[in-house]
């Protein structure tokens, strides 16, 4: 990954073909200025074929034991680019986490309807609040953290542009369960 995610590895999916992302990108939510949608249609266009393959493999059927990757990272991100496509997709990410118990995984999603039941103990679920300037003070049921975006500076911002690898607030179970970042608008 690059930018604030430098140093992290991730499994990404294709936002351009994700029906949820297509719909949300036409709203005034944070998705209306989605960095991934813009990058995959511009500077990261070359990533679309590989990430489309990930979208298909993760969402169409349960992964077999042979398909489960070995992740040799302390922290790993699901979806530096992408969003859950369906329940099968979520279950496959859980399978990957279960297969790699020494790694802490973090998954951001706006798809609360797909999160239910047990999850692996090494998976941090972060609700990605789609509404700018409506800070949720606690995570929804089933989530470990909530990630909020604000348009103007606030004294309680705790995601302030540093490198994620230097902070790790989102990648540790302890610490704040409420993350607040100022919006980075991309057009």
Regions found by a protein language model. Give the residues of each.
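Class I S-adenosyl-L-methionine
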Residues: 1-187
